């Protein structure tokens, strides 16, 4: 009779563990599928930047008080750098500022750079293609 009880405990326990592992596998598969879909939708650069800095584009724009980058112009990047320098210096811990706020300002700049730099590089490449490649080989030309 003790063998029957032990056998039942083992069978019921293995069923419970089997179901738990199956459910955990389903959740892991769904999570990885969702992550692949996010990267496939073109959010790869945005997702990477968001994962590294942990900050959304809206949050970064609010911290530095700039508009969302529309076309990735150099003027937009200059504005970001100007605001960054001012806020970074204002929150210097040696001058009574907050290191936490200073690090938030740095993360906001990094997030905006990750968004603007690829657009600027793409724009420069398009301009090069439009103008053509004109190497300056001779001084008189």
UniProtKB/Swiss-Prot annotation:
It is found in: Mitochondrion inner membrane. Belongs to the TIM16/PAM16 family. GO terms for molecular function: protein domain specific binding. Disulfide bonds: none annotated. It comes from Neurospora crassa (strain ATCC 24698 / 74-OR23-1A / CBS 708.71 / DSM 1257 / FGSC 987). GO terms for cellular component: PAM complex, Tim23 associated import motor; TIM23 mitochondrial import inner membrane translocase complex. This is Mitochondrial import inner membrane translocase subunit tim16. Essential component of the PAM complex, a complex required for the translocation of transit peptide-containing proteins from the inner membrane into the mitochondrial matrix in an ATP-dependent manner. In the complex, it is required to regulate activity of mtHSP70 (hsp70-5) via its interaction with tim14/pam18. May act by positioning tim14/pam18 in juxtaposition to mtHSP70 at the translocon to maximize ATPase stimulation. Pfam families: Pam16 (PF03656). Residues 59-117 are annotated as: J-like.
